[in-house]
Amino acid sequence: MKTELSLLDRSLNLQRYPKRAQELLQAWDAGDEYIIKYVEEELNLEDGKNILILNDNFGALSCWFSDKHNVTMMTDSFVSQRGTLKNLQRNQCNRVQLITSTEEMPQGFDLVLMQIPKNNRMLTWQLQQLRQSMDSSCPIIAVNKAKEIHSSTLELFEDYLGETKTSLAWKKHRLVFSNANVSNPKTIAEAVCWSVDNEDIDLLNYPNVYSGEKLDQGARFMLDHIPSDPELRHIIDLGCGNGVLSVKAGQLNPEARITCVDESFMAVESAHRNLEVNLGKERQFQFIANNCLDGFKKHSSYLVLCNPPFHQGQAITDHIAWQMFCDAKHILCKDGKLLVIGNRHLDYDGKLCRLFGEENVTTVASNSKFVILEAVKAEKSK
């Protein structure tokens, strides 16, 4: 896979995070290249400008513009943040301030660059924050694949931010130009709250939480199959989202210590709030933004709950699920269990059989769309 971004007589070595032996995906896209070309060729910025970059996938924009400017990068993704840091170090770039989506949006910028997020509610929230934080003279330039920029996308920019126009397409990407100048902007709440039908569970969801406006069908199915067992002293919810599975596990296992892990800072913050509200602040909880289970001790958990994502940013991929399964096996105690929910077509059973052994993988439940699989770590497993 190509790792050298060569553009305008400059080169950067950029790699995705975490680094894989046989990487199939690139650490930047044509959208990054389009923004770089436009800023360098059309804006003629003086050195030392203050630039805010939102949703930089693996730091291509941060690395490039930190050469001559003061860059702040804001993201909801732990993986993107860590990947950006690694690429900054790899290219010996100037210091970039890295902040998370749960922090207050800073002010005082001369230019804002944005990779448009996949989640429309996250986009709307970021546009609202930009309208409140940026001067009307500050150019805001966003990018996405042309096929993903609809008239409804541009309406969001105009309703929540200000006057908006678009570029011509280049390498199947398009730029969106806007300024924070709408006189009567629409507003949205920071969080969406709702209750789970037929459960004693109330959930708060920050903007970038997966399925934040209603319970996804996979999680709904999984709720009915979470075990209750006094031997489950430590339960990990891997890819926890808003923490709904953790809340149910905590209700069924009141003595268990529960750890919620997600690569989204907003998901982790949502889970933190939801476990404390539904289960009480006196319980033993831990909330970690992380790349899967990096850094967890071996043989440290009795049950891992897992509802894996099948995309990383805009890219469709199954390597995250595979890493989750491998990490879960590593940290499970002997006879510990991994409970996985997934779409039937994703072949998680094949992956789990390869990893845990066919005799240690069983189907707990299935319906027309989903399957719940249990993998047990046998005594001989390492």
From Swiss-Prot:
Alphabetic keyword roster: Cytoplasm, Methyltransferase, rRNA processing, S-adenosyl-L-methionine, Transferase
Keyword Methyltransferase among UniProt keywords: yes
GO molecular function: 23S rRNA (guanine(1835)-N(2))-methyltransferase activity
Enzyme class label: transferase
Cellular-component GO terms for this entry: cytoplasm
Keyword check for rRNA processing: yes
Chief localisation class: cytoplasm
Highest taxon listed in the record's lineage: Bacteria
Database matches in SUPFAM superfamilies: S-adenosyl-L-methionine-dependent methyltransferases
Catalysed reactions listed for this entry: guanosine(1835) in 23S rRNA + S-adenosyl-L-methionine = N(2)-methylguanosine(1835) in 23S rRNA + S-adenosyl-L-homocysteine + H(+)
EC number: 2.1.1.174
Cellular location(s): Cytoplasm
Xref: Pfam families: MTS (PF05175)
Cross-referenced InterPro entries: rRNA_m2G-MeTrfase_RlmG, RsmC/RlmG, SAM-dependent_MTases_sf, Small_mtfrase_dom
Described function: Specifically methylates the guanine in position 1835 (m2G1835) of 23S rRNA.
PANTHER family: RIBOSOMAL RNA LARGE SUBUNIT METHYLTRANSFERASE G (PTHR47816:SF5), RIBOSOMAL RNA SMALL SUBUNIT METHYLTRANSFERASE C (PTHR47816)
Entry's family note: Belongs to the methyltransferase superfamily. RlmG family.
Identification of the protein by name: Ribosomal RNA large subunit methyltransferase G
